[in-house]
Curated annotation (Swiss-Prot):
It comes from Aspergillus fumigatus (strain ATCC MYA-4609 / CBS 101355 / FGSC A1100 / Af293). CDD domains: crotonase-like. Keywords: Isomerase, Lyase, Peroxisome. This is Mevalonyl-coenzyme A hydratase sidH. The keyword Heme does not apply. It is found in: Peroxisome. Belongs to the enoyl-CoA hydratase/isomerase family. GO terms for molecular function: isomerase activity; lyase activity. PANTHER family: ENOYL-COA HYDRATASE-RELATED, ENOYL-COA HYDRATASE_ISOMERASE FAMILY PROTEIN (AFU_ORTHOLOGUE AFUA_3G03410).
Amino acid sequence: MSTEAHPTVQGCLVSFPTPHILLLTLNRPEKRNCISLATSAEIQRLWTWFDTQPALYVAIITGTGESFCAGADLKEWNDLNARGITNEMTAPGLAGLPRRRGSKPIIAAVNGYCLGGGFEMVANCDIVVASENATFGLPEVQRGIAAVAGSLPRLVRVLGKQRAAEIALSGLSFSASQLERWGLVNRVVEHDQLLATAVEIATAISRNSPDSVRVTMEGLHYGWEMASVEEASSALVDQWYAKLMAGENFHEGVRAFVEKRKPQWRPSKL
């Protein structure tokens, strides 16, 4: 793991369950882990730092207490409104996640209430593991707001228009098991197994070639962003395949397979 100090994040805990995994824990349980503007900017800086650290391969985000995240700090929003200040909704959004396009995967370990901006954050995470106690919702319409940070087109893509409409227009809450059936949640697990499951998945990813993970992330981004699957496939091959084949990890992976040994991966240089 890098010895470079990570950026500080107020109201959060930053730890490293293994040398290759970063764990960010939202730690304002008395406020349902809502995120202030200052904390949002600091978390965004943490993700930028994470993407530049060659020894860190995967990140996990979770929360303490009964909530994962209830979104933005609406008390702060109310104060801004009273002063005539508009809260700008610019990319990449709350905590740097709703419209993030990172080079490394982030796993959401949803431990409880996941509402508003918290749900918008999760909708763009690469893998979602949820506690059996978790609930999800977009109550923005009940507050005179709208979920414009990035989740709506993503939910339409993942769930279909009608399911996305039910979530976004009703403001109702939905169980983790419901969203697992609909395809947004990868796994629903017992509450006390949540973090262990997320770390297990992250560890499996971290054992793989960093170059392969990097190129695979680009392929996933292309599939997400482009209308044509053929255009996305061609873009991935044209822009990344030669780089992957020329890298040390490609040669090491094939050589290790032939020699029947565990590969010794190098930090990605792609």
